[in-house]
């Protein structure tokens, strides 16, 4: 055995390392990697196909081509291992060394590395403080640069042309100064830089400069210089200081003993200029013979050949002392060749190969989806896997899948071989192999045994969330298709129309264990996105269950009574009773103590059959199933069963439900027939009414009472309303069972939630309604026919618009949604649960989500499964309901809701103070398990998947009314939802001429209070709304269903507050106002036009003032004069000099909805929010509380001043003149209120209102988009992503830290610096100041590129830029996140991997403690193996 060991060498264990460092390689280091210099551009000999000596594939340099055999064949076999053949110079060893041995090319003239020159910001340019343009002129031999000005009047780094140089040499003499050209010049410039001095001057300038731009530039430069210098060490030994080669500085100390600072890890700037080019191993750029004598080669060989050719030519020219101009040209060509090798196409023309295809350079090998990172390191292919079509397996249990025998035999081969040997059926592996290939009968028995309880993993692409891969126990089946359990289809998003799935076999015991414990389908009952069950029956099963729980009057056997379920089955079999008859029966259950009892229930035989499979538990009452079950109800039942009876019962229950559903759906014999779609008789009448109303609006338009836009809006409204009416009439007809026919089957399918929806039936049997144009506007003429009647040619043509758009959208959507998921995963991948409790007292306040007065999401749903941060006290009795630090479960939610609490303070990931991760308390419940979240759970990835997975269901764009076509009319009134007392908040009312109160304020709200005085609803009322007369007095009581307020949704009115005589000011005909004569009607109206475009209109401020009889301007209640400014497009409603009453309309501004401005909706809106972009029409928000005043306008902007009376502080805002301003002079605005229409900018919200408001805004906006599609996502997922977006802070005051003002650093780094200051204060230093910083919001792309791990960032986007920056800074990657560990091939630090990680950490800390105890402090230096170099 020892002999063998000696021959083969000890087996090498996998190299283990803790970090990876990347830095710029010095020429010496490149030479030290190399096994020889490559001198010739030849690759292989065309006759012998052996590599040429000293060429790109040279065997002497890179190693032998065949294992243990030199090139000339003198030495063969193992026994000559390690000998170098004296004839051909090749070492006898394994041929795989050709994958790791590198070579090099010695350049005749230095060249600049394109990454450091061109990757913006140019590193060389920053260091030398020169522009990229100047650098290129030096580099490509256009200008000389002064390197050493001597005593002349030239400046350092000054550029000179050839002629200028000669002039200066004549003037000062040739030796008076030094000027050079090309990369040598640049090398000298970099070598002469004294980084330590530069650093000092930069810091000085920073203190003195006032200009922001200059400061930014200096900070950038300073950071770069510090990155080059690296960390410093202090030495006191003079001799060591003298010996040290690199950067060093003396520090004078008051006690006269100098202290020396050396920078041992400093990177020399001149290394950015290459003297030696490394050549990568030949097996990584192979040359492969194809049949037919041709060769396929990697593009790199071409690029290297170019470099070698030009380099050799340059050497020859220099030896021949050729004229300067020729040598220069050759040097320039060499520079271009090296540029192309590193990054083809970055500078100048792209170098193309023989087939006009650009050559792939080293940078291209790393970049993009096909690059090294994403193709090979993050996306490896897997052995022991197969794929096949799936078919439905309704007789399987939930934890099983059907695996074709042929596939199983192939997948489990190694296990079968082992077993065959174990039982002595085969003497060797070879014999076993033969048996398996012949498919002998005993092989099948062994296969059965091997497969027993060995889970396999099934995956369906696209794997959008973690439920796309689940483990099942295989059962062997005949045939070639995989059988899948119907209930897991929702999770896989699978159907059986030809979908394929992949099977993977977990090999090791640990893998099998994880598959069984964590990934088994029975463990994934709840969805990780919302915590609702995902194993929910759908389609046929729902239909079957709906059918057996129906109760119909007048069926056979109605009113009978039964004692047991057996009797019912008997009666059903003998047709004595119908499934749907109303009967009485005994039901055995358990009472609250858990004792068995019998209750008498009124129900149907079908429901009794269902009750048989219901688990018996005190919390599961018979009422749960004693009703008509729709898909939603069934989901609720499964949820209740899971919460009370646990997982095992739920799985058994779900399986039984499925069996029951399928068998009854088939017995029901429900079919889909043309006559099931009934067209309502009222349809004709409704359509005729609508057409009459449309004619009336046309007439009003012709008479000039309404504008074109208003007519359009009204017509669209009428038609949407009519479509709804026809649809509801149709539903009424379909709902009623027809005598002798039973219930309408199409209605049953839709109502149960099995297939189809009311909207689809509406198109089949109602009317199709309005269609959208491609631009998103709605076509005024609706489609009156339905599909049953058939469309006319014109109608069909109109409907193709919308349909085609839908198809185009779907194609775009999938790609966009996938990209959003990728960005989310990348930003959140390192959010992992790393500790149990971070001990923070902070949190956020949760309220119910209320929209338009209705509670959309109740408080209970939002706080379920979160941790309370402040004790919850009952508002009336004062008893403690939930203590701080407890988790809110279903029980607590009930208690809180009963107490009528409307807001709860909870812990949140946003305020979690854990470093490098999140704590379990702040996260709360793991939604997929229903218990507190486990340590090591990768909550970031789960959040990203939960948000990204429904992305494909979101639309690409919702049209303002493309949505409204379905949404019915715009909201134009508020009705009371309950009997209540109404309080008017922020009252600002005026009685108009009819005595109706009109709202004059922008933030008027109606609060509805119940008997106890608790607020139950709150409605925002727009400016200009007419209120119910009863509301003139505060505290009026109103009845449910009363109209509280109404308004015109299509125009914004400008109202008067006093009576008086209207007087036009600056409304000049032809400049700021024009008569618009409607061609169709001949009626004219006055419209305010854009007066700023006119030369005469620059100083105008069109307005209407109110005067009294004497001609004085009327004063308003707040003491200001009554002036009303007009905005562009306002239509004047009063004539000059007309008398007006308070509350009358002076002008109307049409709302933009005729040409709907696309509200960015759907996916793009979600992406816009996560990327923290400025919305297209963003609104300006107020920074302070105060009153609004209008200042003097600028040319294109209006000035709004907000002044706070208490503090006297004021802020002014400039708003473009065309935009509609939503506040009026004298209005009181609060901090964070919008001053104009549009969406606010997230960064502004953060700056003005803080983190919690920002988070609330983002959560609500994102949830709105998902809610519209009916997708439930838990808030905490969005919080996790927002936390990742807020990782950085910007230093506003550096205090006494080493940070710089204005730089952005990680929050942890900032806290660390302040901790150091605190430490110094504890040690007794006086008057130190902490650094102060403000949070910075970054979009998800930017945040993922700024992670601490450069490997993770490089594998995401902009690979070259990330690597350049990392190399310059000499970054160290500590391999903390998931991605980095996948890339270097280790266990990820999440899930079970986090436990291993933790153990390693503990061991390392223990070793350190032991070392300290021994008094030895060995901090091992970085292993050379861990260093990469650019």
Swiss-Prot record:
Binding site for Zn(2+) 1: 70, 72, 85, 88
Protein name in the entry: DNA-directed RNA polymerase subunit beta'
Keyword Zinc: yes
Gene Ontology terms for molecular function: DNA binding; DNA-directed RNA polymerase activity; magnesium ion binding; zinc ion binding
One GO CC term on file: DNA-directed RNA polymerase complex
Catalysed reactions listed for this entry: RNA(n) + a ribonucleoside 5'-triphosphate = RNA(n+1) + diphosphate
Organism taxonomic ancestry: Bacteria, Pseudomonadati, Pseudomonadota, Alphaproteobacteria, Rhodospirillales
Source organism per UniProt: Rhodospirillum centenum (strain ATCC 51521 / SW)
Free-text cofactor note: Binds 1 Mg(2+) ion per subunit.
Binding site for Zn(2+) 2: 838, 912, 919, 922
């Amino acid at each position: 055995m020892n002999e063998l060991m000696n021959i083969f060498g000890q087996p090498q264990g996998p190299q283990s390392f803790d970090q990876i460092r990347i830095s710029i390689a010095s020429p010496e280091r490149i030479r030290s990697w190399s096994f020889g210099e490559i001198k010739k551009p030849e690759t292989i000999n065309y006759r012998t196909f052996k590599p040429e000596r000293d060429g790109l594939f040279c065997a002497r340099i890179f190693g032998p081509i065949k294992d243990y055999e030199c090139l000339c064949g003198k030495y063969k076999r193992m026994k000559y291992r390690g000998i170098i053949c004296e004839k051909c110079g090749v070492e006898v060893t394994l041929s795989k060394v050709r994958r790791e041995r590198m070579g090099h090319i010695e350049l005749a003239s230095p060249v600049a590395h394109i990454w450091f020159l061109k990757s913006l910001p140019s590193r060389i340019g920053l260091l030398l403080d020169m522009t990229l343009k100047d650098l290129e002129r030096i580099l490509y031999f256009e200008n000389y640069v002064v390197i050493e000005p001597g005593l002349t009047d030239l400046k350092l780094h000054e550029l000179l042309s050839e002629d200028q140089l000669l002039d200066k040499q004549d003037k000062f003499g040739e030796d008076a100064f030094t000027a050079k050209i090309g990369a040598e010049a640049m090398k000298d410039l970099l070598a002469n830089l004294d980084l330590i001095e530069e650093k000092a001057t930069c810091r000085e300038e920073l203190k003195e400069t006032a200009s922001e731009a200059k400061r930014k530039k200096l900070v950038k430069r300073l950071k770069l210089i510090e990155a080059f210098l690296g960390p410093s060490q202090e030495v006191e030994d003079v001799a060591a200081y003298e010996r040290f080669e690199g950067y060093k500085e003396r520090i004078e100390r008051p006690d006269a003993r100098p202290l020396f600072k050396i920078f041992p890890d400093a990177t020399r700037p001149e290394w950015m200029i290459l003297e030696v080019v490394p050549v990568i191993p030949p097996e990584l750029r192979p040359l492969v013979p194809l049949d037919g004598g041709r060769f396929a080669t990697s593009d790199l060989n071409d690029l290297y050949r170019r470099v070698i050719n030009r380099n050799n030519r340059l050497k020859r020219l220099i030896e021949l002392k050729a004229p300067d101009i020729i040598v220069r040209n050759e040097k320039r060509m060499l520079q271009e060749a090296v540029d192309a090798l590193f990054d083809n196409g970055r500078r100048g023309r792209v170098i193309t190969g023989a087939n006009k295809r650009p050559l792939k350079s080293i940078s291209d090998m790393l970049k993009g989806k096909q690059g090294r990172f994403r193709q090979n390191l993050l996306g490896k292919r897997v052995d022991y896997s197969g794929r096949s079509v799936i078919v439905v397996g309704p007789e399987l249990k939930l934890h099983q899948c059907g695996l074709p025998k042929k596939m199983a035999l192939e997948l489990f081969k190694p296990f079968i071989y082992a077993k065959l040997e174990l039982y002595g059926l085969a003497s060797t592996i070879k014999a076993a192999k033969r048996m398996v290939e012949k498919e002998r009968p005993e092989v099948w028995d062994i296969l059965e045994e091997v497969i027993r309880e060995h889970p396999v993993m099934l995956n369906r692409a696209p794997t959008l969330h973690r439920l796309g891969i689940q483990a099942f126990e295989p059962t062997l089946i005949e045939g070639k298709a995989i059988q899948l359990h119907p209930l897991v289809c929702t999770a896989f998003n699978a159907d059986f129309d030809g979908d394929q799935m992949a099977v993977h076999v977990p090999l090791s015991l640990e893998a099998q264990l994880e598959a069984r414990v964590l990934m088994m389908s029975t463990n994934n009952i709840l969805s990780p996105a919302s915590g609702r069950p995902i194993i929910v029956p759908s389609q046929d099963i729902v239909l079957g269950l709906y059918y057996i729980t129906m109760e119909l009057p007048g069926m056979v056997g109605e009113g009978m009574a039964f004692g047991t379920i057996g009797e019912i089955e008997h009666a059903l079999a003998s047709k004595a009773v119908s499934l749907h008859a109303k009967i009485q029966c005994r039901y055995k259950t358990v009472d609250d103590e858990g004792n068995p009892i019998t209750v008498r229930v009124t129900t149907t035989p079908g429901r009794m059959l269902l009750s048989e499979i219901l688990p018996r538990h005190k919390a599961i009452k018979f009422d749960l199933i004693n009703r008509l079950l729709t898909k939603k109800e069934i989901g609720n039942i499964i949820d209740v069963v899971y919460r009370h009876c646990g997982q095992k019962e739920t799985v058994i229950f779900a399986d039984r439900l499925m069996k029951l559903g399928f068998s009854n759906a088939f017995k029901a014999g429900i079919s889909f027939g043309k006559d099931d779609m009934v067209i309502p008789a009222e349809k004709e009448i409704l359509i005729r009414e609508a057409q009459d109303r449309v004619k009336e609006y046309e007439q009003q338009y012709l008479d000039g009472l309404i504008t074109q836009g208003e007519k359009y809006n009204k017509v669209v409204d009428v038609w949407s309303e009519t479509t709804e009416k026809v649809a509801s009439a149709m539903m009424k007809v379909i709902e009623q069972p027809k005598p002798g026919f039973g219930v309408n089957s199409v209605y049953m399918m839709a109502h149960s939630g099995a297939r189809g929806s009311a909207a689809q039936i509406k198109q089949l049997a109602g009317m199709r309604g309005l269609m959208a144009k491609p631009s998103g506007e709605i076509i005024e003429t609706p489609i009156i026919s339905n599909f049953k009647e058939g469309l006319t040619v014109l109608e069909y043509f109109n409907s193709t618009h919308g349909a085609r758009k839908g198809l185009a959208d779907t194609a775009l959507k999938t790609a966009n949604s996938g990209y959003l998921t990728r960005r989310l995963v990348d930003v959140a991948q390192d959010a992992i649960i790393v500790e149990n409790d971070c001990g923070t007292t902070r949190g956020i306040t949760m309220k119910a989500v209320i929209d338009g007065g209705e509670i959309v999401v109740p408080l209970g749903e939002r706080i379920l499964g979160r941790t309370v941060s402040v004790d919850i006290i009952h508002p009336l009795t004062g008893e403690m309901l939930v203590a701080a630090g407890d988790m809110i479960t279903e029980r607590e939610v009930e208690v809180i809701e009963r107490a009528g609490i409307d807001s709860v303070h909870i812990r949140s990931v946003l305020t979690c103070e854990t470093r490098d991760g999140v704590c379990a308390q702040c996260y709360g419940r793991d939604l997929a398990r229903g218990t507190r979240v486990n340590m090591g759970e990768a909550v970031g990835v789960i959040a990203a998947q939960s948000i990204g997975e429904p992305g494909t269901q979101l639309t690409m764009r919702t049209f303002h009314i493309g949505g409204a076509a379905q949404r019915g009319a715009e909201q134009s009134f508020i009705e009371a939802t309950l009997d209540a007392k109404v309080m008017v908040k922020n009252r600002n009312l005026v009685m108009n001429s009819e005595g109706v109160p009109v709202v004059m304020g922008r933030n008027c709200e109606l609060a509805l209070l119940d008997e106890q005085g608790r607020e139950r609803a709150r409605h925002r009322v727009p400016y200009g709304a007419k209120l119910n007369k009863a509301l003139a007095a505060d505290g009026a009581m109103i009845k449910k269903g009363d109209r509280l307020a109404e308004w015109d949704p299509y125009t914004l009115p400008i109202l008067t507050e006093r009576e008086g005589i209207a007087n036009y000011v600056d409304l000049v005909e032809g400049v700021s106002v024009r008569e618009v004569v409607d061609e169709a009607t001949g009626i004219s109206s006055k419209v305010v036009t854009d007066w700023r475009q006119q030369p005469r209109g620059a100083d105008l401020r069109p307005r209407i003032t109110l005067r009294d009889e004497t001609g004085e301007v009327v004063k308003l209640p707040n003491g200001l004069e009554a002036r009303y400014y007009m905005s562009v497009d306002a239509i004047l409603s009063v004539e000059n000099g007309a008398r007006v009453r308070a509350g009358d309309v002076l002008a109307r501004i049409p709302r933009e909805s005729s040409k709907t401005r696309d509200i960015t909706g759907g996916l793009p809106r979600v992406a816009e929010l996560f990327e923290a972009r400025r919305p297209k029409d963003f609104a300006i928000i107020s920074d302070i509380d105060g009153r609004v005043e209008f200042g003097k306008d600028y040319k294109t902007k209006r000035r709004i001043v907000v002044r706070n009376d208490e503090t006297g502080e004021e802020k002014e805002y400039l708003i473009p003149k065309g935009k509609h301003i939503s506040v009026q002079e004298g209005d009181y605005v609060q901090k964070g209120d919008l001053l104009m229409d549009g969406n606010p900018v997230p960064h502004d919200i953060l700056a003005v209102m803080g983190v919690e408001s920002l988070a609330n805004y983002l959560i609500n906006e994102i949830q709105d988009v998902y809610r519209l599609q009916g997708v439930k996502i838990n808030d905490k997922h969005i919080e996790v992503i927002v936390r990742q977006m807020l990782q950085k802070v910007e230093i506003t005051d550096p205090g006494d830290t080493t940070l710089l003002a204005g730089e952005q650093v990680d929050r942890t780094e900032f806290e660390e610096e302040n901790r150091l200051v605190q430490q110094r204060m504890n040690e007794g230093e006086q008057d130190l100041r902490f650094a102060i910083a403000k949070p910075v919001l970054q979009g998800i792309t930017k945040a993922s590129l700024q992670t601490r791990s450069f490997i993770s960032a490089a594998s995401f986007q902009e690979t070259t830029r990330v690597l350049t920056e990392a190399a310059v800074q000499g970054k160290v990657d500590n391999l903390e996140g998931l991605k980095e560990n996948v890339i270097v091939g280790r266990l990820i630090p999440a899930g079970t991997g986090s436990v291993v990680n933790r153990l390693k950490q503990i061991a390392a800390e223990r070793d350190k403690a032991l070392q300290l105890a021994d008094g030895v402090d060995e901090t091992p230096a970085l292993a050379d193996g861990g260093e990469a170099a650019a």
